[in-house]
Swiss-Prot record:
NCBIfam families: psaA. It comes from Equisetum palustre. The chain crosses the membrane at residues 60-83, 146-169, 185-209, 281-299, 336-359, 375-401, 423-445, 521-539, 579-600, 654-676, 714-719. It is a multi-pass membrane protein. This is Photosystem I P700 chlorophyll a apoprotein A1. It is found in: Plastid, Chloroplast thylakoid membrane.
Length: 719
C-alpha cells in the first residue's frame, strides 16, 4: 500500500519571503519590537501553525532533512580545513612531537601572535577537536582524501536539502506512515544501526586496519597503498592478515577462529598509539551489526509474525500497577513531544556515558596523550548530554500541556505517577536537602578543621578516611573479571579499573589505573546533590505542568506564561517553561562540578610525563587527594592555580584563551542584567528615550517595547 500524498503543498518563494507567513498575526508585520521575538519563538513551533497532526509530522520530517544537510555542510567544512589549512600529513608522520593544527590566523592588527609553534615548522592554532585522531583511525593518509570527503559531504548536503523539499512539497508521507512503529523499528534497527555498523566494520577491516597496521610499524604514509588498492587486491591484505588468503571459506565452514588475526578480543590499549586496538573495535562493530540485524527482524509488519509494540505495552501489568502501560502506545504515536522526551532522555544519558568512555577507553590512535583534546571531548559530551536531558523534561512538559488527555489515561502508570506526584516530589526534595547538607557539611567541617590547624580531625586519606569502598570494589571486580570471562584477553576493558598496567606513548602517560579516595567520595556526593536538584526541578515542572494546588487551571495558561495575571501575587515562575529555565541553571551547576572534578583529577593522578626510569611526573603533582577535600583547596589549588595561567596568557600565542575567559565572564555578567532587572524598569527607560525621539521628530514606526518577563529570562539563560 502506498501511503504518500502527491503535491500536497505548493512551492512558493513569495510566501517564504514574507516574515511570519506561518501565523496570521505575525504575517501582518510588526507594530512593536515584540514581533521579532515572537517570530523567533514560533517559527519552529509547528503546533502553533496548525492543529493537523499529519502536517506537523511532515514539517518535522522535512526539517530533519534540513538539519542533516546543515550537519553535512559543517562536516564538509571540517574536512576542507583539514585538507586546505592543516598540518595533518606532518602530524601523521610524527604524532608524538607535532601538535594538530588546522587554522592559521592572518596578520591583521597583530593577531598573528595566536599562531603558536605546533612543531614540524608549522605555525598555527592548536586544535582540540580530535579530528586528526579520527582521520588516522579511518585510514586517511593524505590531504586529497580529505578534499574528496569534503566534496562528498557537500553533495550529500545537497541531496538532503532536496529530500527535505521533495518529501514536503512533492511526495509527502501520510500520517499512517509516521505511526507505523513496527516497520520504523525494523528499518531503523536493521538499516541504520545494523547495516550502518556492518558497513563501518567493513571499512575498518578492508581499509583502516591495514593502513593503521603499517602506520604503527613506522611506514611512511606516502608509501602506504591507497584504500582502493587494499579493497581490490586481496593479496595485499593477506600479507598483513594471513587469513585473507582463505577468503570466505572459514566463514561458511564455521571455522571463525581463523579470522582472529584481524578480529581480536585483546582488551586494553595499543602500546604504540595509546588507543583501543582497532582490531578489537572492528570485531565490536561486527558484533553490534549482528545484534541489530537480528533486532531489526523482531517486529510484526506484513507477515503476521513478530512483536507488536501495542500488545507488549498493554500486556505490561504488575500486581500493583493498575492498567499498567495501557494507553501509552496511543500517546507515543500521536504526541511527538512525548516521543521526543523519551528519546532525548535516552540519548542524553548515552551522550554522558560516551563522555566517560572517551577517556576510559580512548577509541582513536594518539587521542589519550593529547590532553587538551581529551578535556575538550569530555566537556563537549557532558554539555551536549546535559542539554538533551533538560530538553527531555521540556518536551515531556509540553506533552503534558498540549497533548495529554486525562480522559483516555485512567489508572495506567502515567496517571498513577501524576496522582502520587506529591509523594514523589516531597521525597525527592528530602533527598536533595539530605545530600546538600551532608555533602557540603563534610566540606565545611574540613575547612573549619584546616583553619583551626587540626588536620588530624579532617576527612582525608591521611586522617579520618571515607574511602569509596563500593566504587573500589567495582573497579577491582572489573580489573579481575577478564581472567575468568575472557581468558584470552590480555587486559581488562579499561586500564582505569586497576591491575597495575600503564600505557605511555612518547614519554606521556596515555592511561593508568585511576585511584579513588576520600576526595572523590566527597565530590561524588556533590555530584549526587546537583543532579538530584536538577531532576527535582525538571520533574516538578513535568508533573505539575497541567495543574497544581496553587494554579489548578495551569493547563489553560499554556507551556510558558510569566504569572497568573495581575490579581494573583506569588504565581510567577510557575509555568512549565520556567521549570526548564531553572533546571537549566542547575544543569550548568552540575556540569561545572563534573568538569572541574575530571580536569583536576586527570591532571593530578593520570596525565603527566614518564622518564626512562619509569618515574611519573603528574601535571599537578598528585595534589588532588589532599587539596580537593576542602573548599579552600578547590579555590586555591584548582580554580586559582589554573585560571591564573589563563589570565596571564596575554602577549603569548595562548592570549585568545585569556580573552575568551574574560569575554565569557562578561557574557555571564551581561546575562545577570536580564535576570535581575524588572521589566517595568526598562519600559520606563524606553518611554523616556522615545519622548526624546518624538521631540526631535525621529520616532520609529515600530514601537519599541521592553522584553517580556519570559523573553528576558530566555536571553539571560542563553547567555
Amino acid at each position: 500500500k502506498i501511503i504518500v500524498e502527491k503535491d500536497p503543498v505548493r512551492t512558493s518563494f513569495e510566501k517564504w519571503a514574507q516574515p511570519g507567513h506561518f501565523s496570521k498575526t505575525l504575517a501582518k508585520g510588526p507594530n512593536t519590537t515584540t514581533w521579532i521575538w515572537n517570530l523567533h519563538a514560533d517559527a519552529h513551533d509547528f503546533d502553533s501553525h496548525t492543529n493537523d497532526l499529519e502536517d506537523i509530522s511532515r514539517k518535522i520530517f522535512s526539517a530533519h532533512f534540513g538539519q542533516l544537510s546543515i550537519i553535512f555542510i559543517w562536516l564538509s567544512g571540517m574536512y576542507f580545513h583539514g585538507a586546505r589549512f592543516s598540518n595533518y600529513e606532518a602530524w601523521l608522520s610524527d604524532p608524538t612531537h607535532i601538535k594538530p593544527s588546522a587554522q592559521v590566523v592572518w596578520p591583521i592588527v597583530g593577531q598573528e601572535i595566536l599562531n603558536g609553534d605546533v612543531g614540524g615548522g608549522f605555525q598555527g592554532i592548536q586544535i582540540t577537536s580530535g579530528f586528526f585522531q579520527l582521520w588516522r583511525a579511518s585510514g586517511i593518509t593524505n590531504e586529497l582524501q580529505l578534499y574528496c570527503t569534503a566534496i562528498g559531504a557537500l553533495i550529500f548536503a545537497g541531496l538532503m536539502l532536496f529530500a527535505g523539499w521533495f518529501h514536503y512539497h512533492k511526495a509527502a508521507p501520510k500520517l499512517a506512515w509516521f505511526q507505523d512503529v513496527e516497520s520504523m523499528l525494523n528499518h531503523h534497527l536493521a538499516g541504520l544501526l545494523g547495516l550502518g555498523s556492518l558497513g563501518w566494520a567493513g571499512h575498518q577491516v578492508h581499509v583502516s586496519l591495514p593502513i593503521n597496521q603499517l602506520l604503527d610499524s613506522g611506514v611512511d604514509p606516502r608509501e602506504i597503498p591507497l584504500p582502493h588498492e587494499f579493497i581490490l587486491n586481496r593479496d595485499l591484505l593477506a600479507q598483513l592478515y594471513p587469513s585473507f588468503s582463505e577468503g570466505l571459506t572459514p566463514f561458511f565452514n564455521l571455522e571463525w577462529s581463523k579470522y582472529s588475526d584481524f578480529l581480536t578480543f585483546r582488551g586494553g590499549l595499543n602500546p604504540v598509539t595509546g588507543g583501543l586496538w582497532l582490531t578489537d573495535t572492528a570485531h565490536h562493530h561486527i558484533a553490534i551489526a549482528v545484534l541489530f540485524l537480528i533486532a531489526g527482524h523482531m517486529y510484526r509488519t506484513n507477515w503476521g509474525i513478530g512483536h507488536s509494540i501495542k500488545e507488549i505495552l498493554e500486556a505490561h501489568k504488575g500486581p500493583f500497577t493498575g492498567e499498567g502501560h495501557r494507553g501509552l502506545f496511543e500517546i507515543l504515536t500521536s504526541s511527538w513531544h512525548a516521543q521526543l522526551a523519551v528519546n532525548l532522555a535516552m540519548l542524553g544519558s548515552l551522550t554522558i556515558i560516551v563522555a566517560h568512555h572517551m577517556y576510559a577507553m580512548p577509541p582513536y590512535p594518539y587521542l589519550a596523550t593529547d590532553y587538551g583534546t581529551q578535556l575538550s571531548l569530555f566537556t563537549h559530551h557532558m554539555w551536549i548530554g546535559g542539554f538533551l536531558v533538560v530538553g527531555a523534561a521540556a518536551h515531556a512538559a509540553i506533552f503534558m500541556v498540549r497533548d495529554y488527555d486525562p480522559s483516555t489515561q485512567y489508572n495506567n502508570l502515567l496517571d498513577r505517577v501524576i496522582r502520587h506526584r506529591d509523594a514523589i516530589i516531597s521525597h525527592l526534595n528530602w533527598v536533595c536537602i539530605f545530600l546538600g547538607f551532608h555533602s557540603f557539611g563534610l566540606y565545611i567541617h574540613n575547612d573549619t578543621m584546616s583553619a583551626l590547624g587540626r588536620p588530624q580531625d579532617m576527612f582525608s586519606d591521611t586522617a579520618i578516611q571515607l574511602q569509596p569502598i563500593f566504587a573500589q570494589w567495582i573497579q577491582n571486580t572489573h580489573a579481575l573479571a577478564p581472567s575468568l570471562t575472557a581468558p584470552n584477553a590480555t587486559a581488562s576493558t579499561s586500564l582505569t579499573w586497576g591491575g597495575g598496567d600503564l600505557v605511555s606513548v612518547g614519554g606521556r602517560v596515555a592511561l593508568l589505573p585511576i585511584p579513588l579516595g576520600t576526595a572523590d567520595f566527597l565530590v561524588h556526593h556533590i555530584h549526587a546533590f546537583t543532579i538530584h536538584v536538577t531532576v527535582l526541578i525538571l520533574l516538578k515542572g513535568v508533573l505539575f505542568a497541567r495543574s497544581s494546588r496553587l494554579i489548578p487551571d495551569k493547563a489553560n495558561l499554556g507551556f510558558r506564561f510569566p504569572c497568573d495575571g495581575p490579581g494573583r501575587g506569588g504565581t510567577c515562575q510557575v509555568s512549565a517553561w520556567d521549570h526548564v529555565f531553572l533546571g537549566l541553571f542547575w544543569m550548568y551547576n552540575s556540569i561545572s562540578v563534573v568538569i572541574f572534578h575530571f580536569s583536576w583529577k586527570m591532571q593530578s593522578d593520570v596525565w603527566g610525563s614518564i622518564n626512562e626510569q619509569g618515574v611519573i611526573s603528574h601535571i599537578t603533582g598528585g595534589n588532588f587527594a589532599q587539596s580537593a577535600t576542602t573548599i579552600n583547596g578547590w579555590l586555591r589549588d584548582f580554580l586559582w592555580a589554573q585560571a591564573s595561567q589563563v589570565i596571564q596568557s596575554y602577549g603569548s600565542s595562548l592570549s585568545a584563551y585569556g580573552l575568551l575567559f574574560l569575554g565569557a565572564h562578561f557574557v555571564w555578567a551581561f546575562s545577570l542584567m536580564f535576570l535581575f532587572s524588572g521589566r517595568g524598569y526598562w519600559q520606563e527607560l524606553i518611554e523616556s528615550i522615545l519622548w526624546a525621539h518624538n521631540k526631535l521628530k525621529v520616532a520609529p514606526a515600530i514601537q519599541p517595547r521592553a522584553l517580556s518577563i519570559v523573553q528576558g529570562r530566555a536571553v539571560g539563560v542563553a547567555h
